[in-house]
Every structure is written in C-alpha cells, then in structure tokens.
Amino acid sequence: QGDNIQYEATITASNPIGLLYGAYELIRLQNTDAYNTGSGNQQNFSKAIDETEKPQVGLRILNHWDNLDGSIERGYAGKSIFKWEEIKLGKKGKGGSISKSLHDRLITYARANASLGINGSVLNNVNASPKMMTAEYINKVKVIANILRPYGIRVYLSINFASPMALGYTKTADPLDKKVQQWWQKKAKEIYATIPDFGGFLVKANSEGQPGPGDYHRTHADGANMLADAVKPYGGIIMWRSFVYGANHKGEDRVKQAVSEFKDMDGKFRDNVILQSKNGPLDFQPREPYAPIFDNIKKTPQIAELQITQEYLGQSKHLTYLAPMWKEFFGFVNPSKLVGISGVANIGDDANWCGHPFSQANWYAFGRLAWNPSLSAEEIAHEWLVQTYENQDEKFTKPVEMMMMTSREACVNYMMPL
C-alpha cells in the first residue's frame, strides 16, 4: 500500500507447494524492495510484480554429513540439528514424540529451505552407519519426515552398502546374492510403509574405505541396480556417488579415476539410478576445473554435488562467498543437462546455524542457484544482505557486497596451489 492506493497480488501454482514457493517469492520481493518503481503507478507496479517461476532442476537436495552421535563430518557450526535422542518412540517402537526445542528448530529449518525451493534432505553422513537401517531409526526418521513434508521437503538416507551383513542378517553384502537382494527389498518395503513419500538412498561405495560391490568383484552398476530394484516399486531413486579413487585404478591420476571407473557402465544403470558427482575432479578445492565425468557420461542422469560447508575454503572462520565459484562451474556444465543439484550442508546447532555470520549466505546461494542457475552471484549477494541485515542503504550494501564478491578469489590466492 502506497500513496493511499491498495494493491493486490495473486499467486497461482499447479500444486500447494508451488503456492508456498510463490508466497516466499512475494516476501523476497517485498523484503528486497524489488518492485519499487518510485512512482506509485499501478501499471508500473503490476508490470514489476508480474513474473513466472519454475525450477531449472527437479532435485534440489541438501546432503547432511551428520553422524548418529551428533558429530558432523566437515561441520563447523556445532553439532547436528538432528537430535535423535530427543525423539522418543512409543510402544513397540512406533509413534513417537519430539522435544519442543527440536521440533521448533526443524520447523525453522524447513521454512528456510522452502523459501529457497530446496525440496530434499539427506539426513545422515555418506560414511553411513548401518544402524540407520534399523527399525528404531526408520521410525525416528518418520517423525522428522512428518515435520518437513508440509514444506515440500522429502527425506532421503545415506546407506552403508554392507548393512545387511553388518547388522547380522546375511553373511555377505554381495549384490548378486539372493538373500542380500531380499533383505534390501524387505527393508525398502518397511521404509515406504513407514514413510510413503521417502525419496531414496544416497550411496558412497568402494570409496575411502567404505564397503561396496567391488568387495565382491561386482561393478557399481551391479550394486546400484540391486538397490534400484528394491525402491523402484515405490518411486524411489538411488543417488550413487562417483567420488571413487584408488579402488581399481591405483597409480592413475586421481582426477581421471571417476571417468575410468564409470564410463564403461554408462547406460547399464536402471532408470532410477542417478550418478552424483562433485563439481571438480579432485575434491572441492578452492579452484579446480569442472569434473570431466559431466562430459563423459551421456546416458545416465547426473546430479552435481556442491560443497556448501567450507572444508577447503576457510571452514567457518573465513568469509568466503561461494556463489562466484558455483557460477564458474555452471558456465561449463549446463544445468539443463542435470536432473538435480545437491549441496553438502554447512548447518549445525550453533545459534546462527552456520558458524560464521556470512556462511548463511552460502546456504542461501545454493538454494537460489539450484532453483535458478541463471541468477548472478551479485544478485544473490544483494538479496541475502538486505534481507539478513534489513538495511538497503548503499553505504552499507555496496562495500559489503564487494567484500563478498572478492572473498573467494582472495581465498584462492592464499590457499592455492595445493
């Protein structure tokens, strides 16, 4: 309302979650004063606010490297927000109650993600504990899923490939073993009976000591397809990480090994298997080229894995704004060729969520770029600044935006070469 004229905004969408996204977009426009024409003219106002939004990729997922004991691998913002001990199950392990503090924290988490269009969350570390597949944790995951669902967020779980053997149900984890296949089929049935909209599994296999099909002279396709068959009846997906080195190609340049490992399997995966690959071929370095696997895999759907947490970029001690780095990546890898974008989360139970006051900007930037990779790093920095600090004075925004925009290059200059 301005100049005694009241305006109305209409939000339409194809589903209820779309309406929620639209409401958050309107709030963003208001908070950033994006439609201020300076004239009070209704025609100009209507033109400014008339827009249609559609996400570039379907899967926009946070990957939490959170362990069941509350620790976080590469976490720099306290302990995990998923306080499993604060979820109490009812009789026979069903039902469940949750502490008010955890419930409130998860609601805030869900709202923050929904405001960015993030629609998935992998709750646990890719270096996964087999305990994640027990009935106790599956029922606790249900409690979290029920909280996130109204905000359009589906839950996923990382799995330990050797779970049936580690939990004592089979003598092997060979993906071609009938008993192993049956165990995963029953486990998938159990999970989907508990959480009908469960998203699927994220898998780190035969990488950095994790078990996998290679332990039994089987291929990644053998392992992924076995799991894919188990979740297929329920609409689930398998996100199989290509971060594999030192298994079958020892001595070869590490940056080539993902292609060497997976290229010959391209086209041999089930249609609900997606290869998830880090943006660079080495390991989330401050500057490295885009991973060649994005050029070499033609028939298998792919997800790009970005790292929001600053493992090699100052952890949560340094201001390092990562949107320029991700824009550099998308300048080489066309997002239209991807089915999803995942981000290794930088979230913890610190009061400010991300450790460093400016690290929230990277969570925000990930969500905005996953929704619309054509946004500029400058636009996103400005959006985050004026919404976070509620200050649109250019005497504040201009120097701080410049500090953000130059921070990644500064980090490269003092972190590189390796």
Regions from the PLM with identified roles:
Residues P16-G18, L68-G70, N127-S129, F161-P164, ...:
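Solvent-exposed loop/turn segments at secondary-structure junctions
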Residues Q1-G2, N352:
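Short small/polar-residue motifs
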